[in-house]
Amino acid sequence: MKRAICSGSFDPVTNGHIDLFERAGALFDEIIIAILINNKKKPLFPLAERERLLRESIAHIKNATIDSFDGLLVDYAREKEATAIVRGLRSNADFEYEKNIATMNKELAPQLDTLFLMTDPNYSYVSSSIVKEVASYSQDVSKLVPQPVAHALKEVYRR
């Protein structure tokens, strides 16, 4: 079975992420959407909320599961017996950053490949940071994120 991992903080998940998951799901037998727990960052949404929002947003992707991890992605990939890591690229800057990580991952886990998928041009400017910034000013982000996320952002910034 070909299993791939799509990892990130997903704080929050965006339509760009969903597009990546759908495309990865078409390429692999199974995809694991793995939420990275980074104790150095303070997320807007707690882990349980990010898991819920992801679950509601990817219900239509039948070969996707959601999990979380801390530590090195290559260690997690070995544990899950994944054959690939899938990363989305929005720009040349993303490529330079991701290429270095992929090279180190290959050094640590030679059996693990990294697959880069170019972001759909409709989402090339979308990031979780931009979404949070725009939502914090009570602006509509419903074209940038799944409906459950748009609702959750309204609730957070209503306070």
From Swiss-Prot:
Molecular function as annotated in GO: ATP binding; pantetheine-phosphate adenylyltransferase activity
EC number annotated for this UniProt entry: 2.7.7.3
One of the GO BP terms on file: coenzyme A biosynthetic process
Cofactor: Mg(2+)
Compartment(s) where it occurs, according to its Swiss-Prot or TrEMBL record: Cytoplasm
Pathway as given in its UniProt record: Cofactor biosynthesis; coenzyme A biosynthesis; CoA from (R)-pantothenate: step 4/5
UniProt cross-references to SUPFAM superfamilies, sorted A to Z: Nucleotidylyl transferase
Marked site: Transition state stabilizer: H17
Cellular component GO terms, alphabetical: cytoplasm
Binding, substrate: S9, K41, L73, R87
EC class: transferase
Pfam families in alphabetical order: CTP_transf_like
Residues binding ATP, per UniProt: S9, F10, H17, G88, L89, R90, E98, Y123, S124, Y125, V126, S127, S128, S129
Catalytic reactions on record: (R)-4'-phosphopantetheine + ATP + H(+) = 3'-dephospho-CoA + diphosphate
PANTHER family: PHOSPHOPANTETHEINE ADENYLYLTRANSFERASE
Similarity comment: family membership: Belongs to the bacterial CoaD family.
Protein name: Phosphopantetheine adenylyltransferase
Organism expressing this protein natively: Shouchella clausii (strain KSM-K16) (Alkalihalobacillus clausii)
Organism taxonomic ancestry: Bacteria, Bacillati, Bacillota, Bacilli, Bacillales
